[in-house]
Amino acid sequence: MLCPPYPDRATDSNRTGFRSHILTHEILGIPVHLLATDRKRRLNNVSTVSHLVTNELPFGCIQQTDLGISTASPLYSLFNLASHVDENHLVMAMYEFCGTFSVFRPSPVVEALLDSIDSSELLPRSFGWRRVKSSSGRKTDLWRREPLIELGELGQFADAMKSERGGRRFARAAKRVTGVTASPFEVQASMLFSTQRCKGGEGFSGFVNNERIPLSTSARRIYGKSTCYADLLFDVPNGASPLIVECQGKVVHDDYDSAISDSDRTTALQQMGFTVMPLTYRQISDRANFDTVRRMVARQIGVAYRSKSPKEIRCEIDLRRNIFIDWATLGR
């Protein structure tokens, strides 16, 4: 176990052990947000902020841990964000929880602990999270894991909580999640393409995220694998070639070997009749560059692109300001 259990409250009446615990001090950060079901048990000070819960919670909203504390489930954690963060940030958090990635920047103390555990092999390689390293072997803040929430669960929970405070905003945000993504880059691209024009996006519908594509025999010979996944796969009308937008993040696409692999993959997909559009972070983060990208996508999917009105441009600038952030600070 990376962290020891919290001290029992009976032996930690002044909560010194709670405040100094590695999970509190080095991972969660101060203040820690607590759920309280009784007004008399609310605790608000420098290190904790209490949120009063007066209604009965749906089953599964509170989960037990091996650390001597109970925690809000991923779904209920997201729901509690709905009243406190920008809607775009809520959508981004939903993408992360429903996706196969997390962004976690360890403090120096936790980094040293991870190094010691890794060198001593105390944690199995299949313990749940795998850190992504760059092509040069550099550690990153990006981690791989299984989704914390299924997309269907998100929709069902949104329907169940509509009448609660923040429920309508939560439901709106949930409907904006287009699929399962594998990186912040894929989330940002998905939001730019799918968000309604009146909210700053392009309003392109009809694409799915990380669609599994079984390769043909000839495509397998080119790429050396039996399947691949399309980051964004657009369904193109009138029998035209389906469009795949590939998000080529610098972390794993920054060396010669990666370039060769990407080229083989693109050729294999083109051999099967797909149109493949590589997309770099610079192309979406720079608004002038993205103008070329969105017009290319519109042309490929058979949409007559219409220039944005001054109001739509202001909404786009606001959307970009919200999504192009340091992802490690999301929700804070």
Question: Locations of the language-model features?
Answer:
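Surface segments flanking catalytic/ligand-binding clefts of nucleic-acid enzymes
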Residues: 137-332
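Short gly/ser-rich loop at a beta-strand->alpha-helix junction or flexible surface loop bordering the NTP-binding
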Residues: 1-165, 309, 317-332
